[in-house]
Regions:
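N-terminal acidic leader/helix
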Residues: 6-18, 22
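Charged, low-complexity interaction regions
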Residues: 24-36, 47-54
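A short local loop/turn or secondary-structure capping micro-motif enriched for an aromatic residue
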Residues: 109-110, 120, 153-155
C-alpha cells in the first residue's frame, strides 16, 4: 500500500457507503422538498456510528452565522497580494469550480464518487461552506490551488492547502500559508493553528517544518471505530519501515499507530 494512503484506507469504505446512501436520499424522485430531504438525510445519518462523519455531512445543509461573519469580516479588508512571488489570495468564485474539481480528481480518496454529479456538487458546496474560510491562490492570473481554514467555528483553526500537480514544488505553499496566517491574525485575531498531515506526505511535512510547525501528537482521520482502526493496522504491519519508525519517534507514538492516524502539528503566527 502506498504510504500516502495509510489513514485514507481506514476511512474509504465507510465514507463511500455512507455517501452513496446520502446521495440516494437526495436524488430520490419522490416529490419531497429539499427541506424534507434534508430532514430525512439528517435522520439517516444520526443512526450512523461515526459522529464526525455525521456532523460533516449534515453540516453541508446548514448555514452557520458565526462562520459567515468571520468570512465577511476577513474579506472586507480585501484580497492579499504577494508581490515578490506574484501570488494573489482571493475569495472563491464560481469560475474556480472546474479547476478545483480537476484538482479533486487528482487527490481525492473518493475518486470513483466524482463520477456522480450530485457528489461533485456536494464537494464544491463544501468548499463554499460559510463555516470555512477558503482562499483561491492565483499566480499571474492563473488558478493554481487554494489554502484556507476548514472550520472557523472550531478552535484551533485547521489549515488546508492543495495545489494543482503542475504547481507543486514551486515554493507556492511557503509564500501563501504565511501570507494567509498573517492576514487572519491581523483581521480576525487568530494566531494559533492546527495542521494535520498523512505520515506518507513528506512534501507537506517538510513545508510545515520549514514554517515552524511543531509536532503535537496524532489524531484519527474521520473514522473513530477502534475495531476498524486496529484492523487497518494489523493488516498493514509490513508497511512499517525505517522512515515510519523515524516519524513515530518524532511524534512519540507507536509506529503501528501511523498506519491508521494522521500527524498533528501546532503552528503559531508570530
Amino acid at each position: 500500500m502506498d504510504k500516502e494512503t495509510f489513514a485514507e484506507f481506514a476511512v474509504k469504505s465507510t465514507i463511500e457507503t455512507t455517501l452513496q446512501e446520502a446521495l440516494d436520499i437526495i436524488d430520490a424522485d419522490d416529490g419531497k422538498s429539499w427541506e424534507e430531504k434534508r430532514a430525512a438525510l439528517i435522520q439517516h445519518l444520526q443512526s450512523h456510528k461515526e459522529p464526525v462523519l455525521v456532523d460533516a455531512l449534515a453540516d453541508l445543509a446548514v448555514a452557520d452565522t458565526m462562520g459567515q461573519q468571520n468570512r465577511n469580516k476577513f474579506w472586507s479588508y480585501g484580497e492579499i497580494f504577494c508581490p515578490d512571488s506574484n501570488l494573489l489570495l482571493r475569495d472563491v468564485v464560481e469560475a474556480d469550480r472546474e479547476s478545483y474539481m480537476a484538482m479533486q480528481k487528482e487527490y481525492s480518496i473518493m475518486k470513483s464518487m466524482l463520477n456522480e454529479e450530485a457528489y461533485c456538487t456536494m464537494v464544491w458546496n463544501e468548499h463554499l461552506d460559510p463555516k470555512a474560510l477558503m482562499l483561491t491562490i492565483e499566480k499571474a492570473g492563473t488558478y493554481v490551488g487554494y489554502c484556507g481554514i476548514k472550520r472557523t467555528v472550531e478552535k484551533p483553526w485547521e489549515i488546508a492547502i492543495e495545489l494543482l500537480p503542475q504547481w507543486t514544488n514551486h515554493g507556492i505553499g511557503s509564500v501563501a500559508i504565511p501570507a494567509m496566517m498573517s492576514a487572519i491574525r491581523d483581521r480576525l485575531g487568530e494566531s494559533e493553528f492546527r495542521v494535520r498531515i498523512d505520515p506518507g506526505n513528506l512534501a507537506s511535512q517538510k513545508l510545515f517544518d520549514k514554517l515552524g510547525a511543531v509536532p503535537n501528537g496524532i489524531s484519527e482521520f474521520l473514522i473513530h471505530d477502534q475495531d476498524a482502526l486496529e484492523q487497518c493496522e494489523a493488516e498493514h504491519l509490513d508497511q512499517i519501515d525505517d522512515h515510519l519508525i523515524a516519524i513515530s519517534n518524532k511524534f512519540n507514538v507507536e509506529p503501528r499507530k501511523l498506519l491508521s492516524h494522521v500527524l498533528e502539528y501546532k503552528l503559531v503566527c508570530r
